[in-house]
């Protein structure tokens, strides 16, 4: 009896295996039919619409980059500051212009007119009554223009921070590029600030930004 039941059991197993194989083949066919709707290795995907403008040619980028380097070299090598001495920091600014440090060797030449200047050195305490004059002189400077805040009083009010008549930082009136700490900062510190401004100008990419628009 046991010998007779073994072939029947094998038949049931074979039928069950066939049914499972048939179900797997049907499921595979369903998955293949769904997958063929989208892109596959044999069916290339359609290119998507680009929302960003195409990049310019490498030759144009190279020419504009070299022009930027040339303009930045000329600009940082001939900084003409507009002196705006307000307090004791101006004495150290004059010290930097003396023969000991000789700022002329860096191309820094003081100008008396804002029309001929591209840098303003705010040296000293800025009061509320002086703030409109500072802004007026800044507006008369041609673009591009830079501002150097020299000393603690120009940076944030300094010793007179809580005074009713003092502006707590000249960056509330004009945009500042370089801050020089100290009360007062030495001539070496101001010279270092000028060198940092030259490094900042060297990294500018004005023409490249204009070219990519």
Curated annotation (Swiss-Prot):
Its EC number is 7.1.1.2. PROSITE patterns: COMPLEX1_20K. It is found in: Mitochondrion inner membrane. Binds 1 [4Fe-4S] cluster. Its cofactor is [4Fe-4S] cluster. Core subunit of respiratory chain NADH dehydrogenase (Complex I) which is composed of 45 different subunits. This is a component of the iron-sulfur (IP) fragment of the enzyme. This is NADH dehydrogenase [ubiquinone] iron-sulfur protein 7, mitochondrial.
């Amino acid at each position: 009896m046991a010998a007779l039941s073994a072939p029947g059991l094998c038949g049931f197993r074979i039928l069950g295996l066939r049914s499972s194989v048939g179900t797997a083949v049907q499921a595979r066919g369903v998955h293949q039919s769904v997958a063929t709707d989208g892109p596959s290795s044999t069916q290339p995907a359609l290119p998507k619409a680009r929302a960003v403008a195409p990049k310019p040619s490498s030759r144009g980028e190279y020419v504009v980059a070299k022009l930027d380097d040339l303009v930045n070299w000329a600009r940082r090598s001939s900084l003409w500051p507009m002196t705006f001495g307000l307090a004791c920091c101006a004495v150290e600014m004059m010290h930097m212009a003396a023969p000991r440090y000789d700022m002329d060797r860096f191309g820094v030449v003081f100008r008396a007119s804002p029309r001929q200047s591209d840098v303003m050195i705010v040296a000293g305490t800025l009061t509320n009554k002086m703030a409109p004059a500072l802004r007026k002189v800044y507006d008369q400077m041609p673009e591009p223009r830079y501002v150097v805040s020299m000393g603690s009083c120009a940076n944030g009010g300094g010793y007179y921070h809580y005074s009713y008549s003092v502006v707590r930082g000249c960056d509330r009136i004009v945009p500042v590029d370089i801050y020089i700490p100290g009360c007062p900062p030495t001539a070496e510190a101001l010279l270092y600030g000028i060198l940092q401004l030259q490094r900042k100008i060297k990294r500018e990419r004005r023409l490249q930004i204009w070219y990519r628009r």
